[in-house]
UniProtKB/Swiss-Prot annotation:
HAMAP family in the cross-refs: UPF0251 (MF_00674)
Source organism, top-level taxon: Bacteria
PANTHER family registered for this protein in UniProt: PTHR37478, UPF0251 PROTEIN TK0562 (PTHR37478:SF2)
Similarity comment text for this entry: Belongs to the UPF0251 family.
Protein name (record): UPF0251 protein Ccel_0627
Pfam families per UniProt: DUF134 (PF02001)
Length: 127
């Protein structure tokens, strides 16, 4: 049996879960929450790989694999006019924030005052 994936720490849940070209495409590229977080840390905030990996509570090698995957998916979507959908992943939101609105993935809540730990308690409130 394979070892379970380590829960990645994220500090941002995007408000928009779908981005599409001007002419809507039926083909989608799915980015996980941790891939979006890696893009945010490395490209938007210009944090080095060591710092970004530490922020996400993962190794530098794992961070490198996540960021490479995210960049490849984004390039594919931009070049081929595909819709980008943000969904799922194996992550934990930083203390004081809620991630219980996600409908898929292995999200874990931290300090969510609306949630009792049930993964289905806020499914109707999708991002």
């Amino acid at each position: 049996m394979p070892r379970p994936k380590k829960c990645r720490r994220v500090g941002f849940i995007p408000g928009n879960a779908c981005f599409h070209p001007e002419i809507k495409s039926q083909v989608q590229v799915v980015l996980s929450i941790e891939e979006v977080e890696a893009i945010r840390l490395a490209d938007y905030l210009a944090i080095g790989q060591d710092g970004a990996a530490e922020s996400m509570n993962i190794s530098r090698g794992t961070f490198q694999r996540i960021i490479n995957s995210a960049r490849k998916k984004m390039a594919d979507a931009l070049i081929h006019g595909k819709t980008i959908r943000i969904d799922g992943g194996n992550y934990q939101v930083e203390s004081g924030r809620s991630c219980c609105r996600r409908q898929s993935g292995e999200c874990r809540t931290v300090n969510c005052d609306r949630c009792t730990g049930c993964m289905d308690c806020h499914k109707s409130t999708n991002i």
